[in-house]
Amino acid sequence: MGEAERVDSPSSKIRVGVVLGGISSEREISLESGRNIFGKLPKQRYEPLPIFMDSRGGLWLIPVKYLMRNATADIEEDLDDGARRIPYEELKKEVDIIYIALHGKYGEDGCFQGLLELLNIPYVGSGVLASALGMDKYMARRLLSLEGIDVPGTARLSLDEWTADPAGIAVRLEREFGFPCVVKPTREGCSTAVTRVDSTGELAPAVEEAFRWDNDVLVEEYIRGMEVTCGVVGTVNPLALTPSETIPTAEILFLEDKFLYGQGENK
């Protein structure tokens, strides 16, 4: 297997492929998540294998020392010097289960989950449908609303619709939501391209920026309130973990505030 490192262990240990990196805007946070997962899996039971997804979607078994790199670009530069490429059709021979540490598009939206199901490889986390619905903010809001849960007023814009009549749509949105309102891509995470809009002049630039990331954009009423995170483990008898509140440091909590040590605050 070349110079790529594996944790020496008896064959009875479960081989866990920790997939990190990826092709989304959140690949740096994925590196942080992958490091944490790799370090915290009990080595007496599991054999963690660091698997890096490069910017073109290829998979590589990387040396453990690569996990200490500061950025995914640093890892990608050295893939030909110590890492081993894993063809997707060979992945099942390398692992017993995949722990998905990918963030954002093609990692949390059901795409990678569906690929693993086609390859008949078990994985940790939500399935294809739940992942896809969770990433699509418009569909998630519709489902929550059907269950009687309050959601902010939302308008969805397609790129074709906006291109055909940006001025008319801007007037309609201002009449419907007023200011401030919030503009965001429909299928991005970690506050990517999320903008608080406080005036008519700010609306079109915010929408254009959101369209750089997705072909669908949401415009929502602005709601000031707490942001709470609560993880849930299991399906038949789900266990809700202790919730935490994210303490805001700005109007919009961005990726660094939510994930990077020392940048944000939770209680």
Language-model regions: role of each:
Residues M1-L129, L133-M139, L146, L157-V171:
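ATP-binding N-terminal substructure of ATP-dependent carboxylate-amine bond-forming enzymes
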Residues K93, I149, F177:
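Structured loop/turn residues at beta-strand edges in well-structured enzyme cores
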Residues L143-V151, E209:
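Basic phosphate/pyrophosphate-binding loop/patch that engages nucleotide-derived ligands
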Residues L144-S145, L173-T192, D214-R224:
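ATP-grasp fold ATP-binding core
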Residues T195-K267:
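Phosphate-binding site of ATP-dependent enzymes
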